[in-house]
Amino acid sequence: MKRHFLIILIVLFQLSLYAQSKKEVKKHKIKASAVSVIENGKTINESKTIFDANGNEIEATDYNKDGTIKEIHKTKYNSKGDEVEDEQYDANNKFVEKKITKYNASGEKSEEIFYDAIGKLTKKHIYTYDGKGLRTERKTTDAEGKIISIKKYVYVTK
């Protein structure tokens, strides 16, 4: 019984680390966190995250149920702490996709540009905002600039 209690306590501690905000990660100088689940007496790793000194998530590894790596994301940030680049790798650490994020003068996300493993543009997300800075639309285009989808955002304020 003590062993089960200890395992549950460890899992809860790991979940609480993973669930921490960027501010808390920085404040407590957390360098890494891991999330695992115990199913039918077997411990299954779900994810591992590495943070920089500013609390930014710089590497995230997701695992399959059998414990093998599913995918890895490596992320870079600008001086304001905004994500500017995310590289995705497969289970064999082979580069799959790169996402570049751009921001407008107000610091709002304006574009996400996706490239495949050979550097070819695959799609773009283009964001628009209203006068209050609220996101109103996300337009997705293919490599040729053809609109694939439009996502509208509506806010109820009263």
Indicate where each model-derived feature is located:
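Buried hydrophobic residues that stabilize the cores of well-folded domains
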Residues: 20-158
